[in-house]
Amino acid sequence: MEVDVNGESRSALTTLPLPVAEASSPGKAEAEKPRCSSTPCSPMRRTVSGYQILHMDSNYLVGFTTGEELLKLAQKCTGAEESKGEAVPSLRSKQLDVGLARSSRLYKTRSRYYQPYEIPAVNGRRRRRMPSSGDKCTKSLPYEPYKALHGPLPLCLLKGKRAHSKSLDYLNLDKMNIKEPADTEVLQYQLQHLTLRGDRVFARNNT
């Protein structure tokens, strides 16, 4: 079924205008009511408010034509109205090919850009996704050491006397490049330095 951009239906079978009584019959209004397009078994309307649905595969990825492609298709249809019998099947097959290409391209971009944040490694350990080159990198300034690899710390941690001993942020545990065999040694070393630093802060406060 063909539908104009305005939403009025055009019937390819009858060219004569229908009487008002036939046009407003309840059967025709019921047939014109759009079916639910989420169920694949129900027949879908081919056009939805100016967009033409080309193809829907099993993953519910729908290929649309917009703008210039609709104009080109309309010009092809008007030019091919004289040889209607031969041109319509080829046009349909071409639309299906375009829809297949579009849906596969959508699927490629989906699998490329929407990666989960945690990627399982080969040996079964889960590792955090390292920041890529496109991510915003905060440079470490010499007079602001707490902005080294993370954003600014919350104010409750900055205003307190023992800010660094309370927060584990300056260790940057999630951004470290840990080698697999010696990761426990690195963590033990850093935790030892953390406790030493905390003891030093406590001793400075007591004196």
Swiss-Prot record:
GO terms for cellular component: ciliary transition zone; cytoplasm. InterPro entries: UNC119-bd (IPR029219). Keywords: Acetylation, Cell projection, Cilium, Cilium biogenesis/degradation, Cytoplasm, Inflammatory response, Phosphoprotein, Protein transport, Transport. It comes from the Eukaryota. It is found in: Cytoplasm; Cell projection, Cilium. Pfam families: UNC119_bdg. The modification N-acetylmethionine is found at residue 1. Residues 1-41 are annotated as: Disordered. GO terms for biological process: cilium assembly; epithelial cell migration; fibroblast migration; inflammatory response; negative regulation of cytokine production involved in inflammatory response; negative regulation of epithelial cell migration; negative regulation of fibroblast migration; negative regulation of inflammatory response. The modification Phosphoserine is found at residues 25, 140, 167. Interacts with UNC119 and UNC119B; interaction preferentially takes place when UNC119 and UNC119B are unliganded with myristoylated proteins. Regulates the macrophage function, by enhancing the resolution of inflammation and wound repair functions mediated by M2 macrophages. The regulation of macrophage function is, due at least in part, to its ability to inhibit glycolysis. May play also a role in trafficking of proteins via its interaction with UNC119 and UNC119B cargo adapters: may help the release of UNC119 and UNC119B cargo or the recycling of UNC119 and UNC119B. May play a role in ciliary membrane localization via its interaction with UNC119B and protein transport into photoreceptor cells. Belongs to the UNC119-binding protein family. This is Macrophage immunometabolism regulator. It comes from Bos taurus. The lineage of its organism: Eukaryota, Metazoa, Chordata, Craniata, Vertebrata.
